[in-house]
């Protein structure tokens, strides 16, 4: 029995924080839910659509269990103020939002992310901006387009795109461009 399994079986523990490598998150989340633990997980919660469906199914079968993820920009004082001003209409009728997220790319091109069999800058970094815009607009995207490249990481161990541009069109008609 590994240390994480003994933690999950400990009846005195009500909540677990999952901060392992991305490719372990889904399995650990599912095990935690099955063992009656509330979950706070680093993102991404999972790497595949099938993993997402399994997490959703497991949580539905254990609907008293709560799952939360580390979408930290929502608690940043600058964005809390922006959201309040946004809701008051202080920016007029919004038709377009643009955001850039500097995620410390250089350091991550050589760390554990570069050695993974799969790493997504969308799930690991850009998700912060996607979540923030969805939160500001209180709307879901209906159209998503993404283009990326690996030019900046060509001489590194990183095997996947380290840059992406995301275009989102929301149900309320607003368009967002995120990098």
Model regions and ranges:
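Beta-loop-alpha module in the N-terminal Rossmann-like domain of NAD(P)-dependent dehydrogenases
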Residues: 1-58
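Acidic-histidine catalytic/liganding microenvironments
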Residues: 10-11, 62, 76
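Short, well-ordered coil/turn residues at beta-beta hairpins
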Residues: 18-20, 136, 170, 174, ...
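A short helix->loop->beta-strand "cap" motif at the edges of active sites that frequently abuts
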Residues: 35-37, 62-65, 174-175
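Hydrophobic residues in well-ordered beta-strands that form the structural core
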Residues: 41, 47-48, 67-69, 98, ...
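Rossmann-fold dehydrogenase core element
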Residues: 54-73, 92-99
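Predominantly a Rossmann-like dinucleotide-binding segment in NAD(P)-dependent oxidoreductases
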Residues: 73-158
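Active-site beta-strand termini and strand-to-loop segments that position acidic
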Residues: 159-161, 166-172
